[in-house]
Amino acid sequence: MITISNLKKQFGETVACDIEQLTINDGDILGLVGNNGAGKTTLFRLLLDLLQPDGGSVLIDNINPAQSEDWKQSVGAYIDEGFLIDFLTPEEYFAFLGKVSGMTQTEVDERLKDFEQFAAGEVFGQKKLIRNLSAGNKQKVGIISALIRRPKTVILDEPFNFLDPSSQLILKHVLTDYAKETGATLIISSHNLQHTVDISTRVVLLEHGVVIRDLPNQDTSAAAELEAYFER
């Protein structure tokens, strides 16, 4: 469970995060939506202890990320390509992630089989450094890196960016299948309302760092209210 209480962050006069209370329950697939500048990425960086809040707190399974490293073993995240070690090939990078997580190379190779369709023959076995991959294939490497350890909490910022239509559709299945198989909590931001509604069990709408809506999304029930909000 993730608990956010009175979390605040400003950059100068700009309010980037002002969340009084938000609880993300175990097993939620939470879609985070909002226009540019809504504070989605700022919230993710606060969750991952990449930014220090001006006030308030974040607890991941009752651990404050600013005070302990223990939460890192249970969280997988990909925000942008700055997370990647781009002078490695994808295989070298995944092997490194496996090693620091206590996985054997056999276990890493077995996990990678789950992503063969998503990789579409463009990531594995190409003998290319990550830095030389296309934006879409870097995105695939980042997403796989967040999932390969099978963490119980996954945070992905705009995962559908840079992906072609086929890869976007496959990714939706990858994420929903992962959630079903592991019971993990997924937190995903996206500008694509359709993809968000398709895969999320709950949708949170942010504007100027504030939670405007927190909608259950059974059978895409949040779609109409979200469309009405963004069309106003």
Where are each of the predicted segments found?
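Conserved ABC transporter NBD signature motif
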Residues: 56-71
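H-loop/switch region of ABC-family ATPase nucleotide-binding domains
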Residues: 189-191
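Conserved ABC ATPase signature
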Residues: 129-133
